[in-house]
Amino acid sequence: MFAIFQTGGKQYKVQQGEKIYVEKLDLEVGSKISFDQVIMVEGSVGTPFVKNAVVNATVIKQGKQKKINIIKFKSKKHHLKRQGHRQPYTQLVIDSISVK
């Protein structure tokens, strides 16, 4: 069984037991979370969400992605600006997908 749910402004297609990376959630490692904004479950499409559908997950890691470098350069002016960014993420493992 698969489901499509949304969190952090993005949509994720998941199956039970799958590990996914989502935008940072303010939760401790080991805590449980349930997503009720389920867009699709095994062929039934919601308008906009499937009623009584829940995706349950457990937080297994909090971290930051690989650093990306941003360089702004003005030619002929000897002006160079360097900046870096590391996007925070939360890694989840999907425990169950249920429709009541």
UniProtKB/Swiss-Prot annotation:
GO molecular function: rRNA binding; structural constituent of ribosome
InterPro entries recorded: bL21-like (IPR028909), bL21-like_sf (IPR036164), Ribosomal_bL21 (IPR001787), Ribosomal_bL21_CS (IPR018258)
Keyword Repeat (UniProt): no
Domain of life: Bacteria
Any one of the GO BP annotations: translation
Record-level GO cellular component terms: cytoplasm; ribonucleoprotein complex; ribosome
Pfam families for this protein: Ribosomal_L21p
NCBIfam families: L21
Subunit structure: Part of the 50S ribosomal subunit. Contacts protein L20.
Family: Belongs to the bacterial ribosomal protein bL21 family.
Name of protein: Large ribosomal subunit protein bL21
Organism, scientific name: Ureaplasma parvum serovar 3 (strain ATCC 700970)
